[in-house]
Amino acid sequence: MAKKDLFHKDIEGRLDELKHGKPKKEKASLGENLNKIFVIALGLMILIGLIFTLIGALRK
């Protein structure tokens, strides 16, 4: 193969880690953490909105 695979060394390194033992957990990036917080906050806002809507509909 004339062209080297760019990810070959990365894949081989990961395979060696898996052979030698338990792989290390990778830390979640800042973007992943912000995304998780945003999704949870959005879900809570939707739930609170639904609860208030139901309370308002039941009062009438």
Swiss-Prot record:
InterPro entries: Asp4. Keywords: Cell membrane, Membrane, Protein transport, Translocation, Transmembrane, Transmembrane helix, Transport. The chain crosses the membrane at residues 37-57. GO terms for biological process: protein transport. It is a single-pass membrane protein. It is found in: Cell membrane. One of its GO terms (cellular component) is plasma membrane. Disruption phenotype: No export of mature cell wall protein GspB, a small amount of unprocessed protein is exported to the cell wall while the rest accumulates intracellularly, probably in a glycosylated form. Cells bind less well to platelets. It comes from the Bacteria. Part of the accessory SecA2/SecY2 protein translocation apparatus required to export cell wall protein GspB. Part of the accessory SecA2/SecY2 system specifically required to export GspB, a serine-rich repeat cell wall protein encoded upstream in the same operon. This is Accessory secretory protein Asp4.
